């Protein structure tokens, strides 16, 4: 009976010590895989960033081409404050100093001609 106990104890000690070694190896392998995964993620992130920058450049180029070919579409309506130096009143309107209600605001408004 003692030999069975000694054999069992010996097998148990070997299993525990080898298990610890395997655990350390597994931990090191996981650490290496994590580091490799991080480098892969960094590479993928940089690639995605480059693609996004290219797309943004294309969109900005298209937008600038559009703005060169288009005229100003928005204008200021009647009775809306305007700047006397840069009037953006709609066609048929003129930027004038008001006669009554705008006097206290000291501003110009778009009025019909």
Swiss-Prot record:
Compartment(s): Secreted
Ranges of biased composition (kind: Basic and acidic residues): 60-69
Positions annotated as propeptide: 22-74
Pfam families found in the cross-reference section: Toxin_22
GO CC terms in record: extracellular region
Alphabetical UniProt keywords: Disulfide bond, Ion channel impairing toxin, Knottin, Secreted, Signal, Toxin
UniProt note on tissues of expression: Expressed by the venom gland.
Keyword Signal: yes
Disordered: region residues: 60-83
Disulfide bond residue pairs: 75-90, 82-95, 89-110
InterPro entries per the UniProt record, alphabetical: Toxin_22 (IPR012627)
Source superkingdom: Eukaryota
Signal peptide: 1-21
Main location: secreted
GO molecular function: sodium channel inhibitor activity; toxin activity
Protein family according to the UniProt entry: Belongs to the neurotoxin 14 (magi-1) family. 01 (HNTX-16) subfamily.
Domain free text: The presence of a 'disulfide through disulfide knot' structurally defines this protein as a knottin.
Role this protein plays: Probable ion channel inhibitor.
Protein name listed in UniProt: U11-theraphotoxin-Hhn1t
């Amino acid at each position: 009976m003692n030999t069975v106990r000694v054999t069992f104890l010996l097998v148990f000690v070997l299993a525990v010590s080898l298990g610890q070694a395997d655990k350390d190896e597994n931990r090191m392998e996981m650490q290496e895989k994590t580091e490799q995964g991080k480098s892969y993620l960094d590479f993928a992130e940089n690639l995605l960033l480059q693609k996004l920058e290219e797309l943004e450049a294309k969109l900005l180029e298209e937008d600038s081409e559009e703005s060169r070919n288009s005229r100003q579409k928005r204008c200021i309506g009647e009775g809306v404050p305007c700047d006397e130096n840069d009037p953006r009143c709609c066609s048929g309107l003129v930027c004038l100093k008001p006669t009554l209600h705008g006097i206290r605001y000291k501003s110009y408004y778009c009025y019909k001609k």
